[in-house]
Curated annotation (Swiss-Prot):
The keyword Translocase applies. The gene is hrtA. Part of the ABC transporter complex hrt involved in hemin import. Responsible for energy coupling to the transport system. Belongs to the ABC transporter superfamily. HrtA family. It is a peripheral membrane protein. ATP binds at G39, A40, S41, G42, S43, G44, K45, T46. InterPro entries: AAA+_ATPase, ABC_transporter-like_ATP-bd, ABC_transpr_LolD-like, MacB-like_ATP-bd, P-loop_NTPase. It is found in: Cell membrane. Residues 3-222 form the ABC transporter domain. Its main location: membrane. SUPFAM superfamilies: P-loop containing nucleoside triphosphate hydrolases. It comes from Staphylococcus epidermidis (strain ATCC 12228 / FDA PCI 1200). This is Putative hemin import ATP-binding protein HrtA. Keywords: ATP-binding, Cell membrane, Membrane, Nucleotide-binding, Translocase, Transport. The lineage of its organism: Bacteria, Bacillati, Bacillota, Bacilli, Bacillales.
Length: 222
């Protein structure tokens, strides 16, 4: 059924100092579809992604997934983020004192997996990206591209239904950026997830099924 964004608006401030950052945003994303959000700085992209991830409340409107408000699927938004949504950020944000394997198993156990289940899932994911030999390595022992690949697999650890990526290649060179986005797309397609990524890099547009342009808080095209 996919994800339906319905009339999402977001206003910051009060009374005379109000600023409307998002204005009646409407679009849909099908299961297995990978879209890119694009627009100038200040167009509302990150605000929208933050609302979709349950990190910020909208002023009005709703986000519907499988016929039900996304924000009512769990008792609180923390459970939503842990179980249904995988986040990938500009920086990998790996925990410096945790080994690669533990970066993933920690997330799995927080979602209710047993240690055995979490280890098996983590090893499966890390093998997919060719890091099975680095399970006991620390983040500083990996390249920037390897760290971001671990961050992607961490986002997929709990079988999320929705993957949200905010400029995940901003700190990578062109070849690494393409490799990372191709990996994100491949996982979204293979697992029929919903993928939404923000990027300014037009060379990455070819990986998207569709580009959604934002301009001044509104959808310019979808």
């Amino acid at each position: 059924m996919g994800l339906v964004v319905k009339d999402i608006s977001k206003t910051f401030g009060e009374k005379s100092s109000k600023t409307e950052v998002l204005k009646d945003i409407n679009f849909e994303v099908k299961d297995g579809e990978f879209i890119i959000l694009n627009g100038a700085s200040g167009s509302g992209k990150t605000t929208l992604l933050t609302i979709l991830g349950g990190l910020l409340s909208q002023t009005s409107g709703d986000v519907v997934y499988e016929g039900k408000s996304l924000f009512e699927r769990h008792t609180n938004k923390a459970h939503l983020r842990l179980n249904d949504i995988g986040f990938i950020f500009q920086a990998s944000h790996l925990v410096p004192y945790l080994k690669v394997l533990d970066q993933l198993t920690l997330i799995g156990k927080e979602a209710g997996m047993s240690s055995k289940e979490a280890q098996a899932r983590a090893k499966e994911l890390l093998t997919k990206i060719g890091l099975e030999e680095q399970l006991n390595s620390y983040p500083h022992m990996l390249s920037g591209g390897q760290q971001q690949r671990v961050a992607i697999m961490r986002a997929l650890m709990n079988h999320p239904k929705i993957v949200l990526a905010d400029e995940p290649t901003a700190s990578l060179d062109a070849s690494r950026a393409q490799e990372v986005v191709e990996m994100i797309r491949k996982q979204i397609k293979a697992n029929q997830m919903i993928g939404i990524m923000i990027t300014h890099d037009e060379s990455l547009f070819k990986y998207a099924d569709r580009i959604v342009q934002l301009y001044d808080g509104k959808i310019k095209n979808s």
